[in-house]
Each structure stands twice: as C-alpha cells, then as structure tokens.
C-alpha cells in the first residue's frame, strides 16, 4: 500500500503503544518474541527428526546461538532433506508470521540476519542451500518450501504482512546465498 494510503498497514512494532494495546484488547492480538518462536520450532524439529538435539541453533536465555554446520539427516530413518522441505507446517493465528519466518523480532523490531533466522521457512531455506548446487535448483526447492508452509490469521492486515514477510524472506535468502537478486519472474 503506497501513495496517500502509505502507512495504513504496518508491523505491530511501528504502531504506537495505544494502538497495540487496543488490538490486544479488542482482537486478542499478542506477539511472540523470536526466542520463544525458536524454542517452539525446535520442538517441532525434535518431533520431525525423532531425536531431541538442537540442529539449527543452541537455545540461550531470551535468544539463541546459531549452529553453522550443515544439518545432518543421517538419523532420520530414511527421510531426506527433500522430505524436510516438503513437510507441511502451519502457523495458526500467524500475525506477521514469526513462526514461519523471523526477518525481525516482532516485539523489539530488531532485524535478524538471514543465517540466524529461526522460522520454519527459514530452516527449510537453509537446508535447501546446504543441499543444492546452484541458484536455479535453489529457486525450485524454495518454491516447494513455500508451498508447504501455511499461515492463518483472522486479521487481514496481518495476512498481508505475513505474506510480505514470506516473500521478502525468500528474496533475502537468495540474495544472501548467491549475492544476486531474484528475477521478477
């Protein structure tokens, strides 16, 4: 939304406190800090991998330390990185979709570098990068990853922000990996 309607829809962190409180009271809208999303997403991965081991990061109080080594699929009983990317994930009441992609902390507004993100899509994009050999193949698998994550929200502005965050996360991840921008197609 641009022109005279610029700023009508904006992330929660850019709204004044009164507007945030009103949305919380009237719509039961709350926003989860990224470190909490990470803890819960780690539990999702523990269930998928079948073992409790922090593959993507190590949890710290109110944060995490990214593990930069490649994600191993050796202990997944025959499942591969492709199965991980194809695994369906859904965030109900997604708001700005911090469980799917953590481009910024929804509470503080702090930008999170691509390689340190903890969303479910972010993890899939990382796994793709670790297992493909070129940008064309990355795009093919990134599309599959996006097709297998879902966000639902009652508030239309949140749905728009969630979609925007998913799109930008893919664009930023591609740029970070290949030091070039995606084609418009």
Specify the residue positions occupied by each region the protein language model found.
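SAM-dependent methyltransferase catalytic region
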Residues: 1-185
């Amino acid at each position: 939304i641009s022109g005279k309607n610029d700023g009508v829809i904006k992330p929660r962190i850019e709204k004044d406190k009164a507007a945030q409180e009103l949305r919380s009271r009237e719509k039961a809208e709350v926003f989860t800090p990224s470190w909490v999303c990470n803890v819960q997403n780690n539990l999702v991965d523990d269930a998928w991998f079948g073992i409790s081991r922090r593959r993507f990061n190590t949890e710290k109080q109110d944060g995490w330390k990214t593990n930069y080594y490649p994600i191993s699929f050796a202990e997944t009983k025959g499942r591969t990185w492709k199965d991980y990317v194809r695994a369906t994930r859904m965030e109900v009441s997604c708001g700005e979709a911090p469980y799917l992609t953590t481009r910024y902390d929804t509470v503080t507004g702090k930008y999170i570098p691509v390689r340190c993100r903890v969303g479910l899509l972010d993890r899939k994009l990382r796994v793709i990068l670790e297992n493909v050999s070129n940008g064309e193949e990355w795009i093919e698998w990134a599309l599959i990853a996006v097709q297998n994550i879902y966000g639902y929200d009652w508030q239309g502005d949140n749905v728009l922000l969630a979609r925007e965050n998913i799109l930008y996360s893919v664009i930023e991840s591609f740029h970070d990996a290949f030091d070039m921008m995606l084609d418009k197609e």
